[in-house]
Amino acid sequence: MSAVPLKNDGAAHAGVRTISVLGATGSIGDSTMDLLRAAPEKYRVESLTGNANVAGLAKLAKEFSAKFVAVADPARLGELRAALADTEIACGAGESAVIEAASRPADWVMAAISGAAGLKPALAAVDRGATVALANKECLVCAGDFFMSRAVAAGARILPADSEHNALFQALASGNRHELTRVIITASGGPFRTWAAADIEQATLAQALKHPNWSMGQKITIDSASMMNKGLEVIEASYLFALSPDEIDVLVHPQSIVHGLVEFADHSVVAQLGAPDMRIPIAHCLGWPDRIAGRAARLDLAKIGQLTFEAPDFVRFPGLRLAYDALRTGNGATTVYNAANEIAVAAFIAQKIRFGAIARLVEDTLNGWVRAGNLAPLSSADDAIAVDHNARKMAATLLPQIAAKAS
């Protein structure tokens, strides 16, 4: 049994749908609120959370008449209370308040809090048996088996909100799980798609941030340039759809129009296409199992003219190879992969290491973790958070050696 409903299970929702948005002030939250804004007659907002942007959070709470609002930073509670003083909106601060927001009664929850901080709130929504649109990578990369098992046990539905996984979700509805032979996740190739390995090694921060298609945050844009982001998506797809690494392929597609493909036993391949706009997969999750009016630009294939595809290069982009290695290793290795990458990207942004050293730090951390005998199954959110914390410490310890080798 899967928590991801590959077929319409009769879950159509009549009347007004109650919504909670965890991470309402981030980029995914912004796209979600834009869609809610377009159809106020269909949705009622229960809870909203934000990290530290109190002004933005309070503005959204008032606009959508939220029942409860939580800010992750405990020090901002007074500021939030003051901003909402002329309303009857309840508010809180800190991790417990964010978890409370996730636990409140809502038909549909957008889990878009970034980082490991999003794991416990997403689990709180899952444990309530909610329909959860999942945009937090750590829930799957750091605790995939555990998270999906909890969702099944609670009767929760997990709807993939990431563009590639949502594409697979839509394409999988064309057949049955036992008929699937492989899924294909597409990658733009990033700004260094045609660069030589030596040039990629020396790439600057400004060059890494020039994504050809998507407008994203700094960290994810760098991950796209290194293809670490695609590695994370391979890991996520494995847990979401119960796929082995051998059932997941990556295909470089520079135009970012085809987002995912599914091949079935009869060798039919079903693909999902759309403009590179996160409002498309979010709208699919928001309306599921129905469809709602979109806010993104309509796709004009004649204007685009051609779609091209290439095999990924695991030599120039070793981060993708390392993701498959971590997935096959299991026992927390994918958590280590993600944690080490976050340390490496932060070091690159701070100009402590070269771009090419990002993958080397991830590989050295993974190897060090295995040699230390740290591999073990994760059976709780605290287990996953502990591995994440300790892997970051190991990566930080290895960082000076990596930096010295590159100098």
Curated annotation (Swiss-Prot):
Keyword NADP on entry: yes
Keyword Manganese among record annotations: yes
Annotated family: Belongs to the DXR family.
HAMAP family: DXP_reductoisom (MF_00183)
Residues the entry annotates as binding Mn(2+): D162, E164, E233
Organism listed in the record: Rhodopseudomonas palustris (strain BisB5)
Reactions catalysed according to its record: 2-C-methyl-D-erythritol 4-phosphate + NADP(+) = 1-deoxy-D-xylulose 5-phosphate + NADPH + H(+)
Gene name of the record: dxr
Amino acids binding 1-deoxy-D-xylulose 5-phosphate: K137, S163, E164, S188, H211, S224, N229, K230, E233
Sequence positions that bind NADPH: T25, G26, S27, I28, N53, N136, E138, G217
Keywords tagged on the record: Isoprene biosynthesis, Manganese, Metal-binding, NADP, Oxidoreductase
Protein known as: 1-deoxy-D-xylulose 5-phosphate reductoisomerase
Alphabetical list of PANTHER family matching this protein: 1-DEOXY-D-XYLULOSE 5-PHOSPHATE REDUCTOISOMERASE (PTHR30525), 1-DEOXY-D-XYLULOSE 5-PHOSPHATE REDUCTOISOMERASE, CHLOROPLASTIC (PTHR30525:SF0)
The protein's Enzyme Commission number: 1.1.1.267
